[in-house]
Amino acid sequence: MLRGSLRSMSEHNYRPRGGGRSQGFSSIPSTQQAHSAGSQGGAHANHGGHGESGGHFDLAQSALDDMHAAGFKPEFGPGVEEQTAAIEKALAQLTPGPGVEDLWGLGWSSIDNDTSRDLDQIEVAERVAGGVKLWVAIGDVAAAVEKGSPIDQHAQAQTQTIYTAVKNFPMLPLELSTGVTSLNESGDRQAVMMTFTVGPDGEMLEEGVSLALVRNRAQLAYSRVGPWLENTAGGVVDDDVTSLRSDSAREHAADESMTSVGALGKDWLVEQLKMQDEAAQALHAARVKRGALEFHKSEADPVVVDGRVISVSEAIQNRAMNLIEDLMVAANGVMARALRKGGRSGLQRVVKVPVRWDRIVALAAEHGITLPAVPNSVMLNDFLEVQRRVDSVHYPDLAVAVIKLMGPGEYMLMRPDDDPTGHFGLAARDYTHSTAPNRRFPDLVTQRVLHAMAHGEPAPYSDADLTAIAAHCNDADKALRKIERTMQKRVAAVAMASHLGEVFAGVVTGSSDKGVYVRVIQPPFEGRVIQGEQGLDVGDRVTVKLLHTDPARAFIDFAKVGMRAVGPSAGNASPAAGH
């Protein structure tokens, strides 16, 4: 799927959309009826009709070739199959062990993409004196995958699961990540659990981290819960929560009776979602007050069937996605503080102060706003919110530019006595990655550190080990992001091959000795300006003509047509007629 420039702020557990995420190395089968990843959440504007030309290009093979060329070995090595079978057998029957709470009976639920099978987290809420208490349970991968084992070696080498529109490269065997370590509906699982109470002002109280036995009672979908929370979808929630359950949950339910609310009561899901949403909004408001940046994201979402690009849609983040984002950001903070309090070193996830703050200041000045010379996230977010309200048409241009100028996140050693580097974009002082161990190696590392702390055991990793892991994950992330960007361009090159000569509105997202790059607004895709690029800088608004596409080389070439004015008076920023 095309994620493009918006990924850099996705430091929470919100996962990328992508059809066939559970298909491993397979492309999306035709039996999914041209299922778009975009149907998994958010509102969509379809820019179809891009698709049949270029369909002969083997996108799936090109993704695999790119992985190999970058030095990755996505195929699992010797010993993995045997280890996987042993883990499946061991986890077939679970009983609470020492220090593991039995919370099977709580009303746990999940919200994720429609086709997701590698579910990392489930949630449950309870109204208590002073606010809403949240339990966030994360699949306990560390309890299943031994450090140094064949599966662990593969996970550490690849560092994460890679999702593209046509081929996924899982970090863990699918029998684990979509099976016995996934929190799919109706399965008993061991989990790492973060608890915290959220007050009306969004402040977090009574934090804790522990181990628990859990069961997901309702596997829900962003695409259904979002409109329901936003009051844009009619109807009520059924007793078996069919109206909000994901496609995947319904397709894989061995016994539909297991999904009924039963003794939990008819209205439990409605109350759960309302409480979770209330807490999430309070958490979000508090983070914004501290300086968290709000980017109202939209993403390109290609429809790919049997490796052929059929069309490109625009997917917009909805309220259900925001709910999960805010709860996971909070849970990651709880974990980071628990490790610090326990005197344990771990990995922190940081976004440093923007190196190109001066360019952000210049962009604000173009809109008549003065930002201070010293980076200030509160004032930056105020500026972004004002622009979103007064100039929603051009807001995507600005958001893309600022995200690019923010720079990427990275991992660093987090010693208990060190002053945290912090996460500039999330306004988080203590922050780690702990909520996606099925698909991110640093999260698995964090779980192992927690297990050792919980059982009074020596640290599984030395500070030197953690420093090396952080460096490797940062290097791998850069290489894997390059592969993703290349695949995004290949998919877009196929999709846009029939639109040569057309003019589009866009914003400059990259400017260096390597070239000038522009992201088109609708449909979202990125290419290089090869004519008239002189003098362009990140954030400049331009109109460009599509000159050439070459999926094999991942080339999309533009010619600059002109500059676009800043602000509401700039006129129509939409692409040429027909788009």
Language-model-detected regions and their locations in the chain:
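Short, compositionally biased
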Residues: 558-568
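Electropositive polyanion-binding surfaces
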Residues: 2-4, 10-13, 21, 28, ...
